[in-house]
Design a protein with these regions (language model features):
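Predominantly soluble domains enriched in secretory-pathway, periplasmic, or organellar proteins
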Residues: 4-323
């Protein structure tokens, strides 16, 4: 579920023209490793420096810790029942893991790979995101139609925010959290500075996955993706995607969008500048979650059928145009 964000670069017309004349080959994408993990991996998160990834194993009640340099599991951390969502703090010191079956969040100390705290949340908790400053973690409670706000310094729930009907996923950028409400076809926007709902955005039926930069949020509703302008909180475009289920992750620079095709066991790569498909890569049956490294060089996707994490590497072209 869930990646770091940054402001998208803007440049002058003259500079853009120069880059356009010198641009060469487009980036290429390939699956460069497949790592066995625990039973039924659901979601994956990348540490800020990119050296480690974490995968939740729902069928094994554990989190696999993967060294991205060697593509090997270096630790397995026992957590609560049915772990699903996971997010890492910006300093990399903690990983927050949602245990859906236990209605709890396990807080992993990443220095020791041990659980430092367990926090009670709501029923059918599923997803978690951490604010850009690392001060708070946000957890969806589907049955209660709320989001729990956790103070990461004290590991306590300090607020519960009512949102739309049956929230299942969420994503944070520098200032807001975007929550997909699957039963009333909306996205709730929470201001992270005030912990209040500032907008509710209608989208297509049964929104699920969401990912965001400081400029845009991308919301999946089955085989359709909605693009939300973060400045106006309006849907500015929609486009089709492969399959109807699976996660989504956009790189911090906004240049690449990865969308999981769960039914097809693949990850589709999109160019957000044109909202068009670039390529599709096989990653394993019942692909689920996807996350990207902070530098955008790699993405990681789960295969629930094969109990693996696929590494997707992006090789840059001769030049990459900012958008």
């Amino acid at each position: 579920m869930f990646a770091r964000t940054s402001t998208v670069l803007t440049i002058g017309v003259a500079t853009l023209g120069l880059l356009a004349t010198t641009a060469g080959a487009a980036p290429t994408y390939a699956v460069t490793a497949t790592v066995p993990v625990g039973q039924t991996p659901m979601q994956v998160a990348v540490a800020p420096g990119g050296a480690v990834t974490y995968a939740t194993n729902s069928g094994a009640n554990s989190v696999s810790v993967i060294d991205t340099a060697t593509n090997a599991v270096t630790a397995t951390v026992p957590v609560g029942g049915g772990p699903t969502g996971i997010a890492v703090t910006p300093n990399g010191a903690r990983a927050f893991v949602v245990n859906t079956a236990d209605r709890s969040v396990s807080v992993i100390d990443t220095a020791t790979n041990t659980v430092a705290a367990t926090i009670a949340v709501g029923e059918f908790a599923l997803a978690v995101a951490v604010s850009a400053d690392g001060a708070h973690a946000y957890v969806t409670n589907g049955v209660e139609s709320t989001v729990s706000v956790i103070d990461t310094a004290t590991n306590t729930v300090t607020a519960t925010v009512p949102v739309g009907a049956f929230p299942i996923q969420l994503a944070a950028n520098g200032t807001h959290v975007y929550v997909t409400n699957s039963s009333d076809n909306t996205v709730t926007v929470i201001d992270t500075a005030t912990t209040t709902v500032v907008d509710t955005i209608p989208v297509a039926s049964h929104p699920s996955a969401v990912t965001a930069t400081n400029d845009r949020a991308y919301v999946r509703s089955g085989a359709e993706m909605s693009v939300i302008d973060a400045a106006t909180n309006t849907v500015t475009a929609t486009f089709g995607v492969d399959g109807t289920m699976g996660g989504a992750a956009v790189t911090a620079d906004g240049h690449t969008l990865y969308v999981v095709d769960s039914e097809g066991g693949a990850v589709t790569v999109f160019d957000p500048g044109t909202n068009t498909e670039v390529t599709s890569l096989a990653v394993g049956g019942s692909a689920g979650g996807v996350a990207v490294s902070a530098d955008g060089a790699r993405a990681y996707a789960t295969s629930q059928n094969e109990n693996t994490i696929a590494t997707i590497s992006r090789a840059p072209g001769d030049a990459t145009l900012p958008r």
